[in-house]
Amino acid sequence: MIILGIDPGLTVTGWGVVAKSGSRLSHVANGQIRTDNKATMAERLVELDSALAAVIDIYKPDTGAVEEVFVNVNPQSTLKLGQARGVAMVAVARSGIPVAEYPTKVIKKALVGTGGAEKQQIQHMLKILLPGVQLAGEDASDALAVAITHANMLGSHR
């Protein structure tokens, strides 16, 4: 089974793809999508949608998961993040792929054992779970964490 994880953001969206075979996970790919901050909001959302559609077309995931939005101190930032997250969910769902959602604390707890884990702890655990993985950046590592969480949740529901 091929699983796509997405860490949505308007400036940078991370994506990660893992393969699950039984209880074994392996890294397939990861990357980051940067939108042009000089473009209009609509243009940036289209750019994000197109890039995610390309990732889905290349890796053909069986299922996907998106990190839930956290409420930011700045309402504008929260709104922009929510719009990027909506585009990510639509990109996956439009492809006929089931899409799940996980809060940040659930993802951190699934990977590190505590919902208050730091980014460095997540990256360290990714290198243990996916030996040899080269991370494209923090957002890509967060997306791989989303994919691994989804893989584990799928396994626990069977």
From Swiss-Prot:
This is Crossover junction endodeoxyribonuclease RuvC. It holds the Pfam family RuvC. InterPro entries: RNaseH-like_sf (IPR012337), RNaseH_sf (IPR036397), X-over_junc_endoDNase_Mg_BS (IPR020563), X-over_junc_endoDNase_RuvC (IPR002176). Gene3D superfamilies: Ribonuclease H-like superfamily/Ribonuclease H. Mg(2+) 2 binds at E67. Binds 2 Mg(2+) ion per subunit. Homodimer which binds Holliday junction (HJ) DNA. The HJ becomes 2-fold symmetrical on binding to RuvC with unstacked arms; it has a different conformation from HJ DNA in complex with RuvA. In the full resolvosome a probable DNA-RuvA(4)-RuvB(12)-RuvC(2) complex forms which resolves the HJ. PANTHER family: CROSSOVER JUNCTION ENDODEOXYRIBONUCLEASE RUVC (PTHR30194:SF3). The RuvA-RuvB-RuvC complex processes Holliday junction (HJ) DNA during genetic recombination and DNA repair. Endonuclease that resolves HJ intermediates. Cleaves cruciform DNA by making single-stranded nicks across the HJ at symmetrical positions within the homologous arms, yielding a 5'-phosphate and a 3'-hydroxyl group; requires a central core of homology in the junction. The consensus cleavage sequence is 5'-(A/T)TT(C/G)-3'. Cleavage occurs on the 3'-side of the TT dinucleotide at the point of strand exchange. Its main location: cytoplasm. The active site is at D7, E67, D139. Keywords: Cytoplasm, DNA damage, DNA recombination, DNA repair, DNA-binding, Endonuclease, Hydrolase, Magnesium, Metal-binding, Nuclease. It is found in: Cytoplasm. GO terms for molecular function: crossover junction DNA endonuclease activity; DNA binding; magnesium ion binding. GO terms for biological process: DNA recombination; DNA repair. One of its GO terms (cellular component) is Holliday junction resolvase complex. Mg(2+) 1 binds at D7, D139. Its cofactor is Mg(2+). It catalyses: Endonucleolytic cleavage at a junction such as a reciprocal single-stranded crossover between two homologous DNA duplexes (Holliday junction). The keyword Cytoplasm applies. Its EC number is 3.1.21.10. Belongs to the RuvC family.
